[in-house]
């Protein structure tokens, strides 16, 4: 069962689509991790990367523009809920390449020396250039393997961007201010 104690008083508990997420919360990377090679741990910032970090941040900023649409209402009626569903769908589509990047990064880390920094770098370039990620994935079976292995890992700042970011840049005190646990929590 699920206990939720926090809600907007006087309003129904609605639109949990964006709040309840399934995934491995211990092994997912944050966006900053995606700017490093998963095997070597080296930053992706050399001249050969052609300002890949800046382009990737710009693309993420464009995707995060959809967060405001999602947070524009509280879901007080059917029209509001429809608007939230549409906004959530647009946000998910915009963040999908970054979530794929996070899955591949995690899978590559899990593979260790069998992972491929080169395949990861090629995918980063594809995402930064806003190219079709599925075509790129199908051309490199190693990416599919890494994606499958890391697919359940939860990248918190890509799943809950409104909590961890403000206008596409990391906040100093970003994150959750809660502890979730099973009752009886008075015995912790």
Predicted regions and their residues:
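SAM-dependent methyltransferase catalytic region
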Residues: 1-188
């Amino acid at each position: 069962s699920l206990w939720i104690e926090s809600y907007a008083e006087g309003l129904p508990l609605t639109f949990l689509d964006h709040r309840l997420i399934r995934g491995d919360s211990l092994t997912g990377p944050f966006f900053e991790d995606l700017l490093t090679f998963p095997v070597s741990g080296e930053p992706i910032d050399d001249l050969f990367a052609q300002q890949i970090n800046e382009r990737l941040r710009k693309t993420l900023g464009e995707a995060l523009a959809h967060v405001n649409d999602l947070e524009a209402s509280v879901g007080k009626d059917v029209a509001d809920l429809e608007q939230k569903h549409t906004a959530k769908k647009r946000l998910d589509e915009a963040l999908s390449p970054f979530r794929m990047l996070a899955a591949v990064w995690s899978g590559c880390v899990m593979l260790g020396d069998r992972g491929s920094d080169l395949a990861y770098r090629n995918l980063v370039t594809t995402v930064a250039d806003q190219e079709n990620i599925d075509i790129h994935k199908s051309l490199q079976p190693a990416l599919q393997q890494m994606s499958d292995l890391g697919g359940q890992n939860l990248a918190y700042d890509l799943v809950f961007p409104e909590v961890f970011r403000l206008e596409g840049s990391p906040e100093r005190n970003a994150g959750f201010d809660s502890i979730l646990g099973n009752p009886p929590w008075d015995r912790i």
